[in-house]
């Protein structure tokens, strides 16, 4: 019992230090990226970047069914039950399948909502010009942002903390290497491509690690979707409370 407790403390300290280092790297890279972004985009470009980023955050949070949070609890409960019964990992794989299935549905839902609300968002956000097309073009970014949230939930629930740390480090560095040249060459025209690349890279890195835990797959059968209702109920509560 004492050895188990000591190992638990060692595990906590180890990953606290790891995530602290990752956070420090993220802050340093973020400062450099923001400095170059402000230099190449100017005040108006920074304003556009902020508005589009806020739109992505709001729509993805509202349309993701709360899966980035509820998915962690849903999978963790299955994993804990499997550990206690020493059974196969079928229940865990089934839980991951549900999370990925509903993440995909939520991603399509978020993209469709973004397209439909494009004119409304333009009128609500801007008092000059017509940026409806820009908001519509955010749909693929929202799609991959929601998908990435589902894969992140899988990594958290299965305890892949090292993978999460690696993903965060690589994402910060890659975003710096991609965004600065794009803003330098294209200026404000590069904002939407950079936001899309960020969302896609986040999903791709998460998927690279999560597929090692459970092979990718979705199931749109009625029985499978019904089995995911507890996931949706919990996720809906998180969305409403957030």
Predicted regions and their residues:
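Helix-terminus/linker motif at the lipid-water interface of multi-pass membrane proteins
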Residues: 28-46, 122-123
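Juxtamembrane loop-transmembrane helix junctions in multi-pass integral membrane proteins
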Residues: 14, 44, 48, 91-98, ...
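Positions in alpha-helical segments
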Residues: 34-35, 73, 153, 238
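N-terminal membrane topogenesis motif
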Residues: 1-29, 90-97, 210, 223-241
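Hydrophobic transmembrane helix module of multi-pass membrane transport proteins
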Residues: 12, 53, 57, 102-242
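Transmembrane-helix boundary and interhelical linker motifs in polytopic inner-membrane proteins
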Residues: 2-10, 41-45, 59-101, 156-163
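Small-residue-rich midsections of specific transmembrane alpha-helices
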Residues: 23-26, 32-33, 46, 50-79, ...
């Amino acid at each position: 019992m004492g050895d188990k407790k000591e190992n638990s403390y060692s595990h906590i300290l180890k990953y606290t230090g790891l995530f602290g280092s990752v956070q420090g790297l993220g802050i340093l890279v973020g400062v450099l990226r923001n400095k170059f972004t402000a230099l190449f985009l100017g005040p108006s470009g920074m304003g556009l970047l902020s508005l589009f980023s806020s739109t992505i955050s709001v729509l993805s949070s509202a349309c993701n069914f709360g899966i980035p949070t509820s998915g962690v609890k849903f999978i963790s409960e299955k994993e804990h039950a499997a550990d206690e019964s020493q059974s196969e990992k079928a229940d865990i794989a089934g839980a991951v399948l549900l999370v990925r299935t509903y993440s995909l549905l939520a991603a399509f839902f978020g993209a469709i909502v973004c397209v439909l609300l494009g004119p409304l968002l333009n009128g609500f956000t801007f008092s000059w010009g017509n940026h409806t097309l820009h908001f519509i073009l955010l749909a693929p970014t929202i799609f991959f942002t929601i998908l990435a949230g589902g894969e992140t939930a899988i990594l958290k629930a299965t305890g892949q903390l090292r993978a999460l740390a690696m993903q965060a480090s690589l994402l910060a560095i890659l975003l710096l290497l991609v965004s600065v040249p794009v803003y330098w060459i294209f200026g404000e025209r590069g904002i939407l491509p950079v936001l899309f690349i960020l969302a896609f890279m986040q999903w791709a890195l998460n998927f690279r690690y999560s597929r090692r835990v459970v092979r990718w797959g979705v199931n749109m059968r009625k029985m499978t979707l019904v089995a995911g209702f507890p996931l949706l109920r919990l996720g809906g509560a998180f969305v409403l409370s957030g």
